[in-house]
UniProtKB/Swiss-Prot annotation:
The gene is rsmH. This is Ribosomal RNA small subunit methyltransferase H. Belongs to the methyltransferase superfamily. RsmH family. It is found in: Cytoplasm. GO terms for biological process: rRNA base methylation. The lineage of its organism: Bacteria, Bacillati, Mycoplasmatota, Mycoplasmoidales, Mycoplasmoidaceae. S-adenosyl-L-methionine binds at residues 34-36, 54, 80, 101, 108. It comes from Ureaplasma urealyticum serovar 10 (strain ATCC 33699 / Western). It holds the Pfam family Methyltransf_5. Its EC number is 2.1.1.199.
Length: 308
């Protein structure tokens, strides 16, 4: 079954931030189902170029079908940690805009075979790139107690990580934990009772932590962001949509490092303009978007521009 319905978060706000030049070169680093790419392409002339990157084969198949007759579009299957090298391979050395949408696409969440959702029963998987070996099943069934505690604490910021890690180790000693709902049940059974009455799902942060570990998500962000910024043309923009505090902290740290004044304090700043500037503190979904698309609720958009 195909799962291709997806509502792109902060779509218009992101495109406005990019200030798309008709003859510019733009890179969608997380193609998904192409919401950003399609709107960028509408603003490009025949001299413009769009590069679509994704590590998910279903997304790549969708992109190839969508843009099969368009010579202005290049589709590349890779993780964006390889951003600079794959662009260099295509003789692209300078870019006018990059988009990173760090959220899971609806097709990934809604396809039960991918194992991302804690609402649907599926084999534990959670791989963005389905050709890689490490998956959620291996982590849940083979990581030591200490490693489970580490990822739950580091990637989920969970205070009772030891309790759940202990429950997982205990349960898997008698029977392998094979499916998402088996894991959800263990999390519920071993969670503090007050957690079960909170508005957010008790398994949410555990699934987030496992997914981040499976895909090495946070470790590659800083490199990819720095690579993108290093390739910007003057007035080029990097726009990034994050979905949880761990991602947003990395975005802020990288952007602020470029945007801060690096001149010694004793040097007068008359008419001085830093090479990079923040385009905004943060942009969040409108009330209308929140009403229309519940999955946008945690999204934050930030942008950085290269002034010269």
């Amino acid at each position: 079954m195909e799962f291709n319905q997806h509502t792109t978060v902060l779509l218009n706000e992101t495109i406005e931030l990019l200030h798309v030049k008709p003859d510019g070169i733009y890179v969608d680093c997380t193609f998904g189902r192409g919401g950003h790419s399609q709107l960028i392409l509408k603003k490009l002339s025949k001299k413009g170029k769009l590069i679509c990157i994704d590590q998910d084969q279903q997304a790549i198949d969708f992109a190839n079908n969508l843009f099969k007759d368009n010579p202005n579009v290049i589709v590349i299957k890779t993780n964006f940690k390889n951003l600079k090298s794959v662009l260099y391979d295509h003789q692209i050395f300078h870019v006018d805009g990059f988009v990173f949408d760090l959220g899971l696409s609806s097709p990934q969440l809604d396809d039960p075979e991918r194992g991302f959702s804690y609402h649907k029963d599926a084999l534990l998987d959670m791989r963005m790139d389905q050709e890689q070996k490490l998956n959620a099943h291996y982590i849940v069934n083979h990581y030591s107690f200490a490693k489970l505690v580490n990822i739950f604490t580091k990637y989920g910021e969970i205070k009772y990580a030891k309790t759940i890690a202990n429950g997982i180790v205990k349960e898997r000693s008698t029977k392998a934990i094979n499916t998402t709902l088996e894991l959800v049940e263990i999390i519920k059974n071993y969670s503090p009772k007050k957690i079960l009455f909170e508005k957010k799902h008790p398994a949410r942060l555990f699934f987030q932590a496992i997914r981040i570990e499976v895909n090495d998500e946070l470790n590659i962000l800083k490199k990819a962001f720095n690579d993108a910024i290093s390739m910007l043309n003057p007035l080029g923009v990097v726009a990034i949509i994050s979905f949880h505090s761990l991602e947003d902290k990395i975005v802020k740290k990288v952007f602020n490092n470029y945007a801060k004044n690096k001149l010694p304090k004793e040097i007068p700043l008359n008419n001085y303009v830093n090479q990079y500037s923040l385009l905004n503190q943060k942009i969040m979904p409108s009330t209308q978007e929140l009403n229309d698309n519940n999955r946008s609720r945690s999204s934050i958009l930030r942008g950085l521009v290269k002034n010269y």
